[in-house]
Amino acid sequence: MASNNVGRVTQILGAVVDVQFDGELPFIQNALQTRIGDRTLILEVAQELGERTVRAIAMDSTDGLVRGAEVEDLGRPITVPVGPGTLGRILNVIGEPIDERGPVDAKKTYSIHREAPSFEEQAASAEILVTGIKVVDLLAPYLKGGKIGLFGGAGVGKTVLIQELINNIAKAHGGVSVFAGVGERTREGNDLYHEMIDAGVIKLGENTTEGSKVALVYGQMNEPPGARARVALSGLSIAEYFRDEEGQDVLFFVDNIFRFTQAGAEVSALLGRIPSAVGYQPTLATDMGALQERITSTKKGSITSVQAIYVPADDLTDPAPATSFAHLDATTVLNRAISEKGIYPAVDPLDSTSRSLDPRIVGEEHYKVARDVQRILQTYKSLQDIIAILGMDELSEEDKLTVARARKIERFMSQPFHVAEVFTGSPGVFVSIEDTVRSFKEIVEGKHDDLPEAAFLMVGTIEDARKKAEALKAKA
């Protein structure tokens, strides 16, 4: 172990630092350590330039670092503490606690760069993960041990949806959850921490967090690109410990995978690589694969991951979201046109897909209802041009009925969220899969053609829609 191998800083380019060693060069991905005043700065070796110099990425701000400063090779990659001691704590990319509650009580550390499980170790599941969110459970159901992506542009509700999933799944789920905040708002990270304390998912005692169910790993928007490009790996290492050593079913939430790619592009440019399409790093697919292939279920335990993925300029063909599509089992696409109608969650029922929408997994009835709902919505979509030009009166009676049902279905896909109660004033609802399938089946069959459209907006089950219709009638 080359722990006493010491070099000197020769060049500083923002987040990228060149270090010259007289002796042996450190390996790629090794951690280097230097002091800036009274703080320690960790760097990660990214390139070897010539015989004596390495180029490293800083995991924190390089303000105050000077040429000639001593840099020590730690002889190993960056490691993070793992195990029950991380639960209830907030860590940064290098595993240091940032919640001002003292050191982390961990018996073990894991490298943030680990091999993905081999083909023989992997295991597949065909069990549905119930989210309590109607549009998701009906049209693009999630699998236990699967990978789920929430795609959406700026401000269409990805973070609120991921927080609702944490609320509905993590609280009901007996196991452990890990949340990686990658390049998102610090305020949201803080809010999430306090919400989890209020919900009892994090239990804060005197110098202890015993009984907590979630570990938080943050590298937020204000961090340098090195930290944002690695923090998802740090969170994943903590999740892998619970999967591999304790055989648990772990929930792994990432907000936001796009920021991981964005940070990779920033670092890549600083390292002098020639960018590929739209200015992304040439190693985009490799970087994404290295992260995503580790998020999987094995014979020992499972990792179910929910990843928010920002879509730049609402363009799903942008290389960053397009690369992540290939790795996912279910995609929930949020659409600005739907959010503009005031329908939340703004999930696009025709764009969202799931591998598990299969009669062998969800059952014949669920599959048929989901396909009928999609057919009605697709017909409505294709009729919209005619309606815009000629108006509703020019449609056949059958088409008029289809449009009326489609508009009701569209509104019925909205529902009040628990985490949005403070904004909406409506109490959140959790709808079981049975109620979801039954309610949509009744709308498709025309049993509720007599109800006004407004009755279907922001309700839970079809019974709630009936009650709302009566209340609207009484008001009128």
UniProtKB/Swiss-Prot annotation:
The keyword Cell inner membrane applies. The keyword Translocase applies. It is an enzyme of class 7 (translocase). PROSITE patterns: ATPASE_ALPHA_BETA. ATP binds at residues 152-159. It is a peripheral membrane protein. It is found in: Cell inner membrane. One of its GO terms (cellular component) is plasma membrane. Keywords: ATP synthesis, ATP-binding, Cell inner membrane, Cell membrane, CF(1), Hydrogen ion transport, Ion transport, Membrane, Nucleotide-binding, Translocase, Transport. It catalyses: ATP + H2O + 4 H(+)(in) = ADP + phosphate + 5 H(+)(out). Its EC number is 7.1.2.2. One of its GO terms (molecular function) is ATP hydrolysis activity. InterPro entries: AAA+_ATPase, ATP-synt_VA_C, ATP_synth_F1_bsu, ATPase_a/bsu_AS, ATPase_alpha/beta_chains, ATPase_F1/V1/A1_a/bsu_N, ATPase_F1/V1/A1_a/bsu_N_sf, ATPase_F1/V1/A1_a/bsu_nucl-bd. Produces ATP from ADP in the presence of a proton gradient across the membrane. The catalytic sites are hosted primarily by the beta subunits. PANTHER family: ATP SYNTHASE, ATP SYNTHASE SUBUNIT BETA, MITOCHONDRIAL. F-type ATPases have 2 components, CF(1) - the catalytic core - and CF(0) - the membrane proton channel. CF(1) has five subunits: alpha(3), beta(3), gamma(1), delta(1), epsilon(1). CF(0) has three main subunits: a(1), b(2) and c(9-12). The alpha and beta chains form an alternating ring which encloses part of the gamma chain. CF(1) is attached to CF(0) by a central stalk formed by the gamma and epsilon chains, while a peripheral stalk is formed by the delta and b chains. HAMAP family: ATP_synth_beta_bact. This is ATP synthase subunit beta. It comes from Granulibacter bethesdensis (strain ATCC BAA-1260 / CGDNIH1).
